[in-house]
Amino acid sequence: MQQGHFTSNSYHSKTLNSSSLPVSSKFSHTNDPDVEGVDNDSFSKALCNKDLDPSSTIRSVISSLLDSLQDKALQQSPNTSLSKLLLEDQDFGSLWLSLSFIFCNYWQPAMLILDSKSIHPLPLTDGEVLHRWECEVDSNNKTTIDLKYWYCSCSQFSYNAFNSSRSFDEPMPKNEQETWGGRCLSHHPTICSHILAASILRACHNLVI
């Protein structure tokens, strides 16, 4: 398979060289689909040069990362290329790398989705934001993603949701300010490559992919 912008080894090397590795690169990772092994306190303080509440959960940290990514993207002029911004803006590249380390088990498939340009937002109604997406590999293979109600129709999402005991932990209070997790009440919202790709595209919706 031919590699695209976000999956090529040379592109990843250039991104690594254009900005220092974030603190998150030192954290351990497991195969658990709910993201373990992240020191929330240290990572929160390192994130975007901002001091966050030491009690921050990984969910709130990821939300802050995505919000910061979106803020940086919105500062760019129209028709700015995502790939160019990643190579030229150190702060943006650092945010991108932080996400790639946190989601190490899902990053490559999500980047393949971005490269294929197979995912797009569904039509919006008045007052809606970009939360409903569709990934279409071919006419017989469509996946629906909803970032508000935190759902994906793919088999990976269903498997991860029911395979993780932490999906059934005591629910957390709903926080409308958190980007990651939507209305899901779990401390560790279920992850799949489609959810990740859609979340990144929503944050960078004004950039040229």
UniProtKB/Swiss-Prot annotation:
Matching InterPro entries: Znf_SWIM
UniProt biased composition (Polar residues): 1-30
Ranges where the record places region Disordered: 1-33
Keywords assigned: Cytoplasm, DNA damage, DNA recombination, DNA repair, Metal-binding, Nucleus, Zinc, Zinc-finger
Domain of life: Eukaryota
Main location: cytoplasm
Gene Ontology CC terms: cytosol; nucleoplasm; nucleus; Shu complex
Cellular localization per UniProt: Cytoplasm; Nucleus, Nucleoplasm
Name by which UniProt lists this protein: Zinc finger SWIM domain-containing protein sws1
